[in-house]
């Protein structure tokens, strides 16, 4: 009766078959994970519990049940030598048991995957495009991901970037624009190609490009022809500032820490137009440095102008020598003149003091001398000529001393015109 009813039952569709296969595959994968967890659990528990039991039994036997005789001790310790071997064999048995279960599980899983693959191939051959696409998206998403990550073939066209499309279009227009003019006027004469640098052509929305003139004519469609827009970007001018290496050793880090230099003590030079990194500058030079971008060639001005010191006056060597000579001779003359004048004035003042003192003493001595002369005249008459001679000598000396300062004082102003003449000269 079951065979009769089975004839009238509807045949399951491919979608139902694939669903059942997916369920079985999922169950087998779960069982494999569960089996691996159980294997680790049982093996770990066996080792832990057996080691704890082994240590406790060894301790108990050593403290209470260890006999004194050597043969009895040997018989008592034999089970302790056999116990690790027993544990190791149990561990291998458990690993073998779980590994066999995983092998059977993997075999069943491989069979289901092969069945699923065959059914999907039949779907791609027999079913329509729409149903086949739906079935593949539902039951075989890995193939779609693999197609997305496949590299493009060599014959496929290379997708250009947004900025590159403009460059290719402008380059193609430059190459195709002189074609009709040359066809009407005939082939132009081919002159020698100058080996100098090519001219720069500015492309809209990008840095200046160099038009590369081909040295030899090539056939259209040959494999050696270069794609327009590829390799036209100039290398750019060399950077005047050093760029720190990315990989630095321990010695470099120590030196940078001691000197106070390094990436952590520098400021990045970012272009204002394309926001690209153009090296690093020191903290003292960051605000005063102006640089040209190495990628878009934009000149980034300095944030501040460096303060300049005031300009010193210019002196020639001959003028400097003349000024030094005049400054060296002038003060010596001026210093010598006042020194001579001061000495003369001091001498004259001292002499005047001496004269005043001498005149006062002479005035005081005059009455004394008169009285003494009278006494002497009374007492001794023949001694008068000697005393008169002494008086006359004293008077002459005093008069000579009075005349000498007057002469010296008169000689002082005679020196003044000579000093003035020296100054004027």
Curated annotation (Swiss-Prot):
The keyword Nucleotide-binding does not apply. Myristoylated; myristoylation is necessary for the endoplasmic reticulum (ER) three-way ER tubular junction formation, but is not required neither for membrane translocation, membrane topology formation, nor for the specific localization to ER membranes. Keywords: Coiled coil, Developmental protein, Endoplasmic reticulum, Lipoprotein, Membrane, Metal-binding, Myristate, Phosphoprotein, Transmembrane, Transmembrane helix, Zinc, Zinc-finger. Expressed in most tissues at basal level, with reinforcement in distal limb buds, genital bud, and in parts of the central nervous system. Residues 15-41, 101-128 form a coiled coil. The modification Phosphoserine is found at residues 114, 153, 177, 182, 194, 222, 316, 348, 380, 411. One of its GO terms (biological process) is embryonic digit morphogenesis. One of its GO terms (molecular function) is identical protein binding. It holds the Pfam family Zn_ribbon_10. Signal peptide: none annotated. Residues 2-45, 99-425 are cytoplasmic. Residues 144-242, 320-425 are annotated as: Disordered. Residues 186-195 have a biased composition (Pro residues). It is found in: Endoplasmic reticulum membrane. The chain crosses the membrane at residues 46-66, 78-98. A lipid is attached at residue 2 (N-myristoyl glycine). InterPro entries: Lnp, Lunapark_Znf. Residues 67-77 are lumenal. Endoplasmic reticulum (ER)-shaping membrane protein that plays a role in determining ER morphology. Involved in the stabilization of nascent three-way ER tubular junctions within the ER network. May also play a role as a curvature-stabilizing protein within three-way ER tubular junction network. May be involved in limb and central nervous system development. Homodimer; homodimerization requires the C4-type zinc finger motif and decreases during mitosis in a phosphorylation-dependent manner. Belongs to the lunapark family. This is Endoplasmic reticulum junction formation protein lunapark. It comes from Mus musculus (Mouse). The lineage of its organism: Eukaryota, Metazoa, Chordata, Craniata, Vertebrata.
């Amino acid at each position: 009766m079951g065979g009769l009813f089975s004839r009238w039952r509807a045949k399951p569709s491919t979608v139902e078959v694939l669903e059942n296969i997916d369920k079985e595959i999922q169950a087998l994968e779960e069982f494999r994970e569960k089996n691996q967890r159980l294997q680790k659990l049982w093996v770990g528990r066996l080792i832990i519990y057996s080691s704890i039991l082994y240590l406790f039994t060894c301790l108990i036997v050593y403290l209470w049940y260890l006999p004194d005789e050597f043969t009895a001790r040997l018989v008592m310790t034999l089970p302790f030598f056999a116990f690790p071997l027993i544990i190791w064999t149990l561990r291998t048995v458990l690993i073998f048991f779980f590994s066999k279960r995983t092998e059977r599980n993997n075999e069943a899983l491989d069979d289901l995957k092969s069945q699923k693959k065959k059914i999907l191939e039949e779907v791609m051959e027999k079913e329509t495009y729409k149903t086949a696409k739906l079935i593949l998206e539902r039951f075989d998403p890995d193939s779609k991901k693999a197609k997305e990550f496949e590299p493009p073939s060599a014959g496929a066209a290379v997708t250009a970037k947004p900025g590159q499309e403009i460059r290719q279009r402008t380059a193609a227009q430059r190459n195709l624009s002189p074609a009709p003019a040359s066809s009407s006027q005939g082939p132009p004469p081919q002159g020698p190609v100058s080996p100098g640098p090519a001219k720069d052509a500015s492309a809209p929305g990008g840095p200046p490009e160099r038009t590369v003139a081909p040295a030899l004519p090539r056939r259209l469609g040959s494999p050696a022809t270069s794609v327009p827009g590829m390799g036209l970007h100039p290398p750019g001018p060399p950077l005047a500032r050093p760029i720190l290496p990315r990989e630095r050793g321990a010695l470099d880090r120590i030196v940078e820490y001691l000197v106070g230099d390094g990436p952590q003590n520098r400021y990045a030079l970012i272009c204002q137009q394309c926001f690209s990194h153009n090296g690093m500058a020191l903290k003292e030079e960051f605000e005063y440095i102006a640089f040209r971008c190495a990628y878009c060639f934009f000149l980034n001005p300095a944030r501040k102008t460096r303060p300049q010191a005031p300009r010193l006056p210019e002196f020639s060597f001959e003028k400097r020598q003349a000024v030094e000579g005049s400054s060296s001779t002038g003060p010596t003359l001026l210093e010598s003149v006042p020194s001579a004048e001061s000495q003369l004035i001091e001498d004259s003042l001292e002499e005047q003091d001496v004269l005043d003192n001498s005149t006062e003493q002479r005035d005081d001595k005059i009455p004394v001398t008169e009285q003494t002369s009278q006494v002497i005249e009374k007492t001794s008459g023949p001694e008068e000529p000697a005393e008169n001679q002494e008086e006359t000598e004293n008077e002459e000396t005093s008069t000579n001393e009075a005349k000498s300062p007057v002469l010296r004082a008169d000689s002082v102003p005679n020196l003044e015109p000579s000093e003035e003449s020296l100054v004027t000269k």
